[in-house]
Amino acid sequence: MKKFSTLVAITLTLSLFLVSCKEAVEKKQNTTNTEEIKEPKKPASVVVFNANLATESDLVALGFSAEVVNKLLAARPFLSMSDFTAIIEGENTEELFKKIFVPLNLNTTEEKVFKIIPGVGDKMAHEFEEYRPYTSILQFKREIGKYVDEKEVARYLDYVFVPVELNTSSEDDIKALPGIGKKMTHEFLEYRPYKNLAQFRKEIGKYVDEKELNRLERFVYIK
C-alpha cells in the first residue's frame, strides 16, 4: 500500500510538472505571436515649411523670436536661400533647415548649395546637377529615384523645384510648383500664349498682390 501511495504521488507530481511546462510553452508562443503581429511604429512625418508661405504662428512655433518673425514677414518673398539666411543669422541653421526652407531651382542652383539640404552630401548634390536640365519634376523623381527610395525622393521635393515654361508646361508640372494650387494653375493656363513676362505679371497680378507675384515669377520662364 505504501509503495502504491508513493507511486501515485510520483505520478501526480509528474503530471503537474508536465502541465506546468505545457502552459509555459503556450504562454511563450502566445507572447511571440503577439510580438510578431505588432507593426513597427512609423516615425512621425516632418513638416518642412516654405519660408515664403509659413504663417506668423508657424514661425513662432519654430522658435523664432517676435523680432525675427516680423523681419521675415516684412522681407518676403525670399528669392534665394541667402536672402533668407541673412535674416536668421545666428540661428542653428542645420536644425532649422529640417523644418523651414526656400526651395532651390534645380536648373540654376550651384552644386555646393544643394548640400545645405538636410541629408544631401557630395554624391547626391552631384547627381542633382548631373541630370540638368530638368524639364519636369517627374524627370527629377525618375532620375534621382535610381539612387534613393521613393520616400526619400518625396522628401527632396520640399527643398527643390523645376521651373516651368509658361506656354508649354503641363498642368501637372505647374501644380507641382511650391504653393501653387488648382485655381492658380488654371489661371496660368487661361492666359496662354504669353508673349513675355510683363504679360504674365499683368494677368496673374489680377489675382495676387505684388509680393506673391514676385514669388510666382521665380518659377516661370518663356522660351
Show which residues each predicted segment covers.
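Small-residue hinge/turn detector
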Residues: 65-66, 121, 181
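Post-signal peptide N-terminal segment of mature Sec-exported envelope proteins
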Residues: 29-52
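Bacterial signal peptide processing site
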Residues: 22-24
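Disulfide-bonded cysteine-rich modules in secreted/extracellular proteins
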Residues: 49-54, 104-115, 164-174
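Bacterial N-terminal signal peptides that target proteins for export
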Residues: 1-8
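Accessory alpha-helical DNA-binding modules that contact the DNA backbone or grooves
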Residues: 71-108, 124-167, 184-221
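Short amphipathic alpha-helical boundary/capping segments
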Residues: 58-63, 114-118, 174-178
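C-terminal motif of bacterial Sec signal peptides marking the signal peptidase cleavage site
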Residues: 17-20
